[in-house]
């Protein structure tokens, strides 16, 4: 595995801090409370790329499992038994997918960044809802119907998460044009061309 440069380590550390901070920024919407955690996992993939984005999010998850209170309800290895832990695992794959998608094929654009985010959102929902359903029904003995899990963990969460996808695409494009972006070697020429 390729060694990380100082810049890459700093950016990974920055995103670990941003994801942690976003977890505790609570925005009340009606009877629900939303955080900015998803926004920063989206940006981790877009800005850092597939490999580093996944590394940054995985490091955040590992810190929480080691007991550092970076999750919404604390931390520690027992957190894997939380119904919502599947979302944390899914964020790793989501960051990888976002970074991979925007660095393959066509030039980077707002639309391409948004598609990467929406694809990542689907990944998070599929894994997160499945984990929530399985843990609720077979681990903590708090059974819920699958439809209820889909409704409360997916359908009702989709509008605010879609807004975060829109915001992350805009911020990601600004980062791309300003050079705050990890560019794979074979895409450097394309990056310079778009930013020119």
Language model feature labels by segment:
Residues 1-56:
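Hydrophobic transmembrane alpha-helices
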Residues 40, 51-52, 85, 112, ...:
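Residue-level recognition of membrane-helix boundary sites in multi-pass small-molecule transporters
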Residues 18, 22, 26, 44, ...:
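Alpha-helical membrane-inserting segments
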Residues 10, 14, 18, 40, ...:
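Lipid-exposed faces of alpha-helical membrane segments in multi-pass integral membrane proteins
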Residues 1-6, 176, 180-196:
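Short, charged juxtamembrane terminal tails flanking transmembrane helices
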Residues 109-188:
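Membrane-embedded alpha-helical hairpins and interfacial helices in multi-pass inner-membrane proteins
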Residues 10, 14, 77-126:
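Short helix-perturbing small/polar motifs within transmembrane alpha-helices
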Residues 22-34, 59-94:
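Interfacial aromatic-anchored transmembrane helix boundaries in multi-pass membrane proteins
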